[in-house]
């Protein structure tokens, strides 16, 4: 029987982030979703069910305006001149439909304005277009004034050009020229910057990545931290993506758990951060790179175990 340790950790994190809330009242949580290259619908359902099952949380969901859903035309085989001509015409028509849709729904983004201040914790399950200035300011103000924030998996892929968000998450899925490459020093358990010359595995490009999904061991780096209570010092996570070479700054990053990224699974032969937290103003921000789920995936183990 699989042990639901990731769900236990998730609930513990949100409880600790909302420690100032009255013990008699449920902790109010808002999940942000609607755009993501992953299956954000089922990820949100899983997060919501996990929290509500504890009886400690009241969970609401705020979903971004819908994207243009019609898939792009399929590309023809190489050398198929007639197919290429038909594809070009179909793609041109598709682009016009997409443009017309976006124009018709441009005002939807102005109407999307979650009331962050009404909640103790925000769960970020969003990886899509950058928000408008007013929404970004409200989000920043929420965290600065003491709100809790939890970023799930691909949420740390987003908002590359938003300085406040980059400071909140410390490191994320970024290109090779962004910030510093972050790893975990196995001896100290601390986040460290790694120079390209010190990489143990040399590959083309040094931006963020991952190898094939596989099960891997999580190692506690701050077992005494309140967020880690009830979590073993080592535990086996189900098959998931093990992010490596995430980039940003280690300056105020506190690692809670890491995993060894093995070359056997396309990894770096270094310890990579899996769960970490940071202060931002009076708020606390927790980020986990775990929780991969594509649309159509039949296994939810990466979200549960």
Protein language model features and the residues they cover:
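Bacterial N-terminal signal peptides that target proteins for export
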Residues: 1-13
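Hydrophobic h-region of N-terminal signal peptides that target proteins for export
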Residues: 12-22
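Helical hinge/lid and interdomain linker segments adjacent to catalytic or ligand-binding clefts
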Residues: 24, 28-32, 39-159, 293-297
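Active-site rim elements
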Residues: 34-37, 127, 204-206, 211-216, ...
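Catalytic beta-strand/loop cores that center a nucleophilic Ser/Cys/Thr
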Residues: 52, 58, 105-108, 118, ...
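A glycine-rich, often tryptophan-bearing local segment used as a flexible ligand/cofactor-contacting loop or short
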Residues: 115, 121-124, 128-229
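Structural detector of well-ordered beta-strand residues that form the stable sheet scaffold
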Residues: 148-150, 256, 286
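Glycine-rich, aromatic-lined ligand/substrate-binding cores of catalytic
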Residues: 279-285, 290, 305
